[in-house]
Amino acid sequence: REVAKTELNLEMAATAEMQEIALALRPDSVCVVPERREEITTEGGLNLSDAPASLGDMVATLKDAGIHVTAFLSPDLKHIQEAARFRSAAVEIHTGAYANANRLRVEHELKRVKDAAGAIRHLGMRVHAGHGLHYHNVQPVAAIAEIVELNIGHAIVARAVIDGLAAAVREMKSLMTAARHGLAT
């Protein structure tokens, strides 16, 4: 925690062990994600309909410690309504289906993200998005007004190997800013 001079976000599974780590680290926020041992990366959002009551207790404990809690969810309205019930501060929309969509489905998946963003904002939560976003697909998502945070890691790090971290971040930021101002390329 001493190293991070900006906002620190911890992505974590909804386990007692991770809760202890979060309480010890005191990040500014946590994003609760599903964790399946067989996955290399998160392949979907939390299923809050089947979430145990202990998840609500975990959210309350983290909030009491001053940690903002975000739920990582697929763009499914049923799960978004559940996030409001758990009193999440924010929802991160899982954009994997959009990122992996072929040309025939990409507009449909983008509409799902837009509709989810509107519903999340309407319920009073902050809207974040991420998963599979890269330099060629980020602008339509960045243009969604309700989204206040994008989480992009792999694409930036991969580009940084070739161009350097500063240039990779600068290029991604430029794409996102252009999309916000209606100047998407």
Where are these regions (language model features)?
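Glycine-enriched alpha-helix->loop->beta-strand junction motifs that scaffold or abut catalytic
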Residues: V3-T6, L25-V30, D64, R85-V91, ...
